[in-house]
Amino acid sequence: MRTRPPPVAPRRRRPLLGLLRLILSSLWLALVVVAPLTAAWVASSLAAHAGASTRLALASALLVFPVVPLLWEAFAAWRRARRPATRRFLTLSDRLVLRTLAVSFVFVGALLARNPQRAFEALNGRGDWMLDGRHDRRAETARRTLFRVAAKSAWLYHLADAPPPRPQPLPEREVARVTPTPSGTGPTPSGDEPAPVLPAPPRDPHAWPWPADGPHAAVLALTPADETSPAAVGRFLAAHEHDQWHLARAVHDYVADRIAYDVVSYRTHRFPPQDAETTFRTRLSVCAGYAALFTAVGRAAGLTVETVVGRARHAVTDGMGEGHAWNAVKLDDRWYLIDTTWDAGGVDAEGFHKRYGTSYFLTPPEVFLSKHYPDEDRWQLLPVARTPGEFLRMPPLRPQFFGYGLRLVSPDRAESDARAFVNVVIDNPRHVWMMVSVRPDGGEETRCEVSRGTSTTARCPLNGRDLHEVVFFASNQRYGSYEGVGSLSVHNR
């Protein structure tokens, strides 16, 4: 008599296991979409940063991913057909996903490894190229998301950063000064005759900018007998100036007045010692020596002083800039920023030219950080520290731009795109006189058509598909010298 086999118990469903499989499958498939899109974003951002065709870069990147993985799969199938049959563990879908991921990683890795610093600047500066001209809520949300992702690429910049000792940047460059023709011929700084230049509002005696009316009286009173060491100078200045704010000014003026920039060392990248004693003795240094001497003299005078290191730039094309050093001084329980190097003078092809200034003395942090970026976030002196990407996107404006009471309205980015011409809008509540010029890379400068008022507007022609530099000049007088106060870059699309 046959016995019946025991009934097979039905398999118990495991909903958690099924949910886990669904989640993993979804993530697996999402990777095959996200990876190629990331590669296309990197490639097109690099193209936008270089002024090349973003459409071509985007199309090329997207074309690679369906084509290369499929060709790879076809080649693998051809090789498999010529061998004895073996069992496959992966489905066709799994193999295509893995091949797509491999191609994506190689493609992105090659783009990043070729020039990590340029890749960082492209993602953080032009990573939102596809949103140019759009400022609606969705566009701004997408822009913030893209730049949050781009900010994660900061390791690329640090990877490419040169190890100490780093080359130091030149002092603030001699900016071209232009003198408009008084006659009615040719371009003029404005159209109709507007109201006269409005005076600046009354200033606090400690408020920035401080008047550049010459070195402090205590500095002028120094004799060779008083100037035997940094400590002796600090004690002398403290004995002749009891106000802490003006004492800081005296220390600043001493360093900016006594030290010349070492152009030869900068250009040969062979730097002698940059300590305070050597700088004091030789009267020659790059920025590290300026900062070290300010620290030594300031501390000897009884001030709380620190040396700050970071990066500084002159123009948009400098990216994050070069290694630089400056100072921070504590007055009335608050920290302030000082750059004696850039207040000492300027450099051109002939060498260093002494030109005393106070633009970088106790400069407001938001103004100072237009061209300086410290290695430590705490020395930004801002409630919320700016990221390297935010620094890159800011136009490099000189302190004089803010000293004239100006505010850049549009374009509000260091680097942007335009077609045939670009309109520049600057808020100008004091009615200062302005000129704007545009120059293509390697080309000749062209004056822009400027209309003047509480809002200055300039229409600048873009000639050729090159990168153009737009430079702003300002003056309190219509006729005479106009000083450069800032610049930005525009790609002609």
Pin down the residues of each PLM region.
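Mixed-charge, low-complexity segments
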Residues: 2-162, 168, 236-237, 348, ...
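Secondary-structure boundary elements
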Residues: 185-286, 295
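Residue-level preference for alpha-helix termini and adjacent loops
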Residues: 236, 258-260, 279, 337, ...
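Hydrophobic/aromatic-rich core segments of domains that either
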Residues: 289-368
